[in-house]
Structure formats: structure tokens, C-alpha cells
Amino acid sequence: FSAVADGHALKSVPVINLEMAKVMADACEADQKKSSYNPVNIAIVDTGNDLVLFRRQNDAYLLSIDIAIKKANSSAGIPVPTRVIEELVYGKDKSGGVIPGLAFSKDLVAFAGGLPIRTKSGVLLGAIGVSGASADEDEQCAAAAISAVEDIL
């Protein structure tokens, strides 16, 4: 959708709203319960890294609050899964990545658990970050969240 006002085109872009974020967080929590991994913190941000939703499960690690938010921000900001950022920093075999300096970025998280959220056509909507379980389980939870809204992306 485009509108023209005084010769200037206004572009309409899809956004993550609170209702979509709640569906995603619910799906992540359902995956955590089904798979019985540690409780998690869930952060969902838009493309400007503004927090749309944050949810902390009972007994999720307090230090993971900040990590979940930073995973979401990292994945929205670059925008790739934080697992890819880990590979860029440390390499797939952990012998050194092609961009090791990323590790020194203050708010960047370079391990799995953050995923970008995109429309089917590839438009970036934001990202989800999950922290509290293992990195692989965090990523599994984030993937379950995105899968829950695939039909409307």
C-alpha cells in the first residue's frame, strides 16, 4: 500500500503488534513445557529494537533477562540468527571467525537463541530472543514462536 501526499510517497510496512507477540510467546512457552527444558525469558522487538513484549517464565534465570533482550536486538540489528553471529565471531569450528571484532560490540550476543522475524516475502519485522535454557533449546523455543505465526507472515 502506498499513498501520495503533496508529491511524497508514504510507504506502509507490516509491523509486529502485541497480539502477534503474545501468540509467539505462548508458542515458545508451550515448546518449553513440552520439551521440559529450563524456564526461559522471551523478548520480542521490532525493527527499531523497541521491545514489543517481554515475558519471564517462573524460575527463569534473572541474568537471562538481559541476554534475551540482547539476543533479540542482535538478531534484529544485523539481521541474522544469533547462531550466525556466533559463527562470524568464533568460526564454525571455534578456531576464529571472519569478523572477530563483533565480539567487542557492547550489546551484541554471539550465541544461539535469537532469530529474525520476517514476512514470507522477506521483509524484516523484528526479532525474538530467548534465554534461560541451553543455546540450542533457546533457539528451538524461538523457532517454535515464529512457526506459530507463519500463516500470517
Can you describe what each PLM-predicted range is?
Residues 1-2:
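Classical Sec-dependent N-terminal signal peptides that target proteins to the secretory pathway
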Residues 5-153:
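Flexible, solvent-exposed loop/hinge segments and secondary-structure transition points
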